A protein has these predicted regions:
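A cross-family "folded-core" feature that marks the main globular domain of proteins
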Residues: 1-347
Length: 347
């Protein structure tokens, strides 16, 4: 008798995604993005079924969206949250659903048009983006262009102060004029935030450093979060995080910024709790992370403490920081090992 054995590299994600993409829920979310002025009745018509049938599935999305702090109204097919949060949701939705099929383009706007915009961007910034960076940028560009036609995004004054302090924002304005991108001020500011938070500009020191120093000079919430981390690492591990290094500041600010734009685990299709998994599989590491969380909250100011509430997303980022600097090892109690001669002497 043949035995079916699951290997470690078994592509369970791809198989699950294949079936999920055939579901009503996936098609409904996709429909909501592509036809934002439609209602549930329109979706039922497209699916050649009754409203009551699709409503049974649609109402299951209420708790699904709730975990991302988004309110979903099934009959109206409306999402209520900040526009930055909603756009981030759709970015992760399409990014994760096409991760194994890079040739798939899920948006209305032509991919070739977006590619022309990116070529112009590279020319003005005098950089060459990687394939990964181009894909990230292309997804965000498509989403921002398509959604800005009917719903505007807002950027807070604190972040606008960073933009005002960064002279390289003028390059983004120059680029938008060159390609005739009809973004208002907030839309362009939001795109700037995306470019620096999602690694589009990563690897280009002149822009990274300028952005990091702008955050530092403006003493933003993200920069204070990095300062808070530095203090806690010093007190918990006697480790000095070099927050004078602009590249480090840039990267650490970036993951905090991403957590401000979207609440929860960005892997939308597997509702995994890395915290619970670690609690079960690596209890010692879990307890260190829990202590880190408590120390971060205890030392944070009110605004930073509020941002730390998105621990479900920040957990992995902070874990990677501790792992990168081998700080889990420094928390191990030393074990005395006696050599044979020492044992004899002790008798």
């Amino acid at each position: 008798m043949d035995v079916i054995k699951k290997e470690k590299d078994f592509p369970i994600y791809n198989i699950y995604l294949h079936f999920y993409k055939a579901s009503y829920n996936y098609h409904l979310i996709d429909f909501m993005y592509k036809y934002p002025r439609s209602v549930l009745k329109d979706f039922a018509k497209e699916q050649f079924t009754s409203v009551s049938t699709v409503f049974r599935y649609a109402k299951l999305l209420i708790p699904y969206f709730r975990r991302y702090h988004i309110t979903f109204h099934p009959f109206q097919l409306e999402l209520n949250a900040s526009e930055a949060n909603i756009r981030s949701f759709f970015y992760y939705f399409y990014w994760n659903s096409t991760r194994e099929s890079s040739d798939k383009w899920p948006f209305h706007i032509e991919q070739k048009e977006i590619e022309k915009y990116i070529v112009a961007f590279e020319g003005i910034y005098d950089i060459t983006l990687t394939i990964f960076q181009k894909r990230v940028f292309s997804f965000w560009l498509a989403i921002n262009i398509e959604r800005s036609s009917f719903r505007k995004v807002r950027v807070d004054n604190e972040y606008k102060s960073v933009i005002s302090d960064d002279p390289h924002f003028n390059l983004l304005k120059k680029w938008s004029k060159q390609i005739n991108l009809s973004f208002n001020s907030d839309e362009l500011c939001f795109l700037y935030r995306i470019i620096y938070s999602f690694g589009v500009i990563d690897g280009n020191a002149i822009y990274e450093n300028s952005h990091a120093y702008a955050h530092q000079r403006q003493n933003t919430c993200s920069y204070r979060a990095v300062e808070n981390l530095e203090k806690v690492l010093q007190s918990m591990f006697r480790f000095s995080l070099d927050i004078k290094d602009p590249e480090l500041i840039f990267n650490f600010i970036a993951f905090h910024e991403r957590s401000y734009l979207f609440y929860g685990n960005p892997d939308l299709f597997f509702n995994r709790s890395y915290i619970e998994e670690m609690k079960e599989e690596e209890p010692r590491t879990y307890h260190i992370m829990e202590k880190l969380k408590k120390e971060l909250q205890a030392n944070a100011d009110l605004d930073v403490s509020k941002k730390l509430e998105n621990w479900a997303q920040l957990f992995l980022d902070y874990y990677y920081v501790l792992d990168y600097y081998d700080l889990f090892l420094t928390n191990v109690k030393p074990i005395k090992i006696l050599m044979g001669a020492s044992i004899i002497l002790c008798k």
